[in-house]
UniProtKB/Swiss-Prot annotation:
Keywords: Chaperone, Cytoplasm, Stress response
Cytoplasm as UniProt keyword: yes
Role played: Participates actively in the response to hyperosmotic and heat shock by preventing the aggregation of stress-denatured proteins, in association with DnaK and GrpE. It is the nucleotide exchange factor for DnaK and may function as a thermosensor. Unfolded proteins bind initially to DnaJ; upon interaction with the DnaJ-bound protein, DnaK hydrolyzes its bound ATP, resulting in the formation of a stable complex. GrpE releases ADP from DnaK; ATP binding to DnaK triggers the release of the substrate protein, thus completing the reaction cycle.
Sequence similarity: Belongs to the GrpE family.
Keyword Hydrolase part of the UniProt annotation: no
Known partners and oligomeric status: Homodimer.
Name this polypeptide is given: Protein GrpE 2
Main location per the UniProt record: cytoplasm
Amino acid sequence: MDNQEKKTNYQNTDKENDLEKNKEKKNDESIFQNKKMNEIREKIFKNKKEINNLKLRHLANIENIKKNTEKKIKKIKNAEIENFFKQIIPIINNLEDILTISTKLNLNDEPSIQGIELTLKSLLSILIKFGVKIEGKKNEIFNPKIHDVILTESSNTIEPNYIISVKKKGFIFKKTILRKAAVVISKT
């Protein structure tokens, strides 16, 4: 082989080597870019997941706020209703006292007394419609949670610890005792 051919061979080999190096370089760059793309995709996926978690937490917080607000509103509403009922009870007492006195004075047939009786019945039926339970009935067993004893009497017809008579009715609204019934019970 002559020099010229050797030179051409070297040049071709150099060109091939350069091409190989360029291919390797491009291949390395491609691998590097793929790694970078995968890292970016991973970050995007993590960010989306985190955003989704934040949204879910935010929605849960909103639900909790709604529930707590509803509970508070219900509690305030019940407290106001209880307060209203407590304001009505003295009026009921006054009407019952008038009817008791009218019975003693034998005035039950008077139109004004009959009007008072109807008013009292109307008030009591309204309370019942709104969920107020009226406590204290004759021949009912005494319960210290809902009854106050104002007197004890001996009785041949009523068993011990049973109510002989009710002096003032008791009122309960949703497990809240607005007023205990004032009762007379039989002695033990």
